[in-house]
Amino acid sequence: MNSFPNIAIDGPAGAGKSTVARLLSKELGFLYIDTGAMYRAVALKAIRKGVDLADQPGLSRLAAVTSVNLKTDAEGNLRVFLDGEDVTEEIRSPAVSKAVSLVARVPAVRERLVELQRAMASGGGVVMEGRDIGTVVLPDAEIKIFLTASPEERARRRREELAARGYIVDQHQMVNEITERDRIDTTRAAGPLVPAADAEIIDCSSMPVEKVVKMIVARVSAGRRE
């Protein structure tokens, strides 16, 4: 295995991908790429511009003239820039969460962002998380992980995340939103949410995130010794 392999982490909303990917990138000294944040940035722009989320040609035109960049600040936290503006906090709003799957299902939007994502990973040493990293974006990634958890557990985690940002959402409502998002993500024509054939599937409903990270680090270490 390459000493600086690319690691693909996929899974549904709330499965813990971002937390695992962030910790893993720090542990290994790799670049962390949150592809979901990139789609959220495009969704935010669509909302701001008043683009109908059912208007796929309109969303395609929007994506074509949109710049999304990811940078790490002095504390090692990922910052998301939309056309030069830091939108790291705003893209996590409930409105964007509802819109992002509708934006991400547009083929031209995915093509635009996948191009950017592949360029970021061209040198290796990347931890990239999203919905179709191991199947579409980086099908040749040396390590592929698919994280999953029950809808109830994912809803609980998402509610806690939103509460920390000042948003209060009912648990039942959140479960319904998670379930609907799963439906959209798994049935879309472009890059549907499915595990890669060679991915390791990890159910982290009750598994501490530290244990998940330790398992993946062990895989990287074992590969380097081969």
Curated annotation (Swiss-Prot):
Pfam families reported in the protein's UniProt record: Cytidylate_kin (PF02224)
A Gene Ontology term for the protein's cellular component: cytosol
Catalytic activity reported: CMP + ATP = CDP + ADP; dCMP + ATP = dCDP + ADP
UniProt GO BP: nucleobase-containing small molecule interconversion; pyrimidine nucleotide metabolic process
Keyword tags: ATP-binding, Cytoplasm, Kinase, Nucleotide-binding, Transferase
Binding site residues for ATP: G11, P12, A13, G14, A15, G16, K17, S18, T19
MF-aspect GO terms: ATP binding; CMP kinase activity; dCMP kinase activity
E.C. designation(s): 2.7.4.25
Xref: InterPro entries: Cytidylate_kin (IPR003136), Cytidylate_kinase_dom (IPR011994), P-loop_NTPase (IPR027417)
Compartments, as annotated in UniProt: Cytoplasm
Family the entry assigns: Belongs to the cytidylate kinase family. Type 1 subfamily.
NCBIfam families reported for this sequence: cmk (TIGR00017)
Protein name in UniProt: Cytidylate kinase
The gene coding this protein: cmk
